Structure formats: C-alpha cells, structure tokens
Amino acid sequence: MKKYILTIVFLLAAELIIKAQTADPLVSKCVMNAGENTRYLKDFRVQLAKGSPSEELRYKTQMSLWKNTKYRFSMCNSEDSKGELILTIKDNTNKVVLSSYDQKSGKIYPFIDFICNKSGIYQLNFDFSEAEQGSGVGVVSMVR
C-alpha cells in the first residue's frame, strides 16, 4: 500500500514540476538571443500602454550587480508592440551609467554589455520608444 501511495505522490509532484517549468516563448527567445557564452540571471516582463513622451522611463525596478562582472542586458519585443523596448541603467546617485538608446543617432540596441565597476543596487528603467504601447521582456545575463 505504501508503494502505491508513494508512486501517486511522486507522479503528482513530477506533474507540478513539469507545469512550473513552462516558459514564456518571448523570454525563451530573448535568453537564446543573449548568446552561448552567457548565463541567464533574471528577466523583467514589461507591458505598458501608450504614454506621453518624456525624459523619464515608466517601468522601474532594481537589481544588485557585482563589481568586476560583465552583464548582458537583452531586450525583446512582442510582435504586437508598437515601440521598441529601451533600457537605461542608473547607479545609486541616479546617474545614467548605460542606455540601449543612443540619443545622438536615435539608434536602439537590442542588447548592451555592462562591466560593473562598483557593487551595488542599480536602477533598471524600461520603456518603449516614443512612449508607445508595447509588451516585451528584458533579460539579464552574466557573460562568462
């Protein structure tokens, strides 16, 4: 009897584990685009309605980054997004350290590499170009 109960418990646990690992296709695509020499750390799903263009990016989150570590930030858009996902990284003094949007050329990069020179909490600010509506994901990876 114990054997049957253990088998049922094991099967139920296995089913829960398999269902929990169902990945978002957009996240999977973005992780694969980060490159073979990277290790996935975290993803941020961003979904925003159309806003008014301003200097401030609308989706803000924080992440702890470590000194002497190279990070890759990859941005991917869903097919129905009207704008392209943009990322700006700020340090603890609110100074912009790096951005995927080059204001001079107007170019938006699909990924940016960042070598952290100081451990600490960094603010990650996301938005879509021209404050358009969109859905996307930002993936943080460590470059080996």
Where are the regions that the model predicts?
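Bacterial Sec-dependent N-terminal signal peptides
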Residues: 1-25
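Edge beta-strands of jelly-roll/beta-sandwich modules across compartments, strongly enriched
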Residues: 130-143
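Extracellular and analogous surface-interaction loops
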Residues: 59-69, 113-119, 144
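Non-catalytic extracellular/lumenal accessory regions of secreted precursors
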Residues: 21-59
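Short, surface-exposed beta-strand/strand-loop-strand elements in extracellular ectodomains
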Residues: 80-96
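Noncatalytic modules at the cell exterior or secretory-pathway interfaces
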Residues: 114-132
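Hydrophobic beta-strand segments within beta-rich accessory/binding domains
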Residues: 60-78, 123-127
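Extended, low-complexity, turn-rich repeat/linker tracts enriched in Gly/Pro/Ser/Thr and Asp/Glu
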Residues: 77-85, 130-133
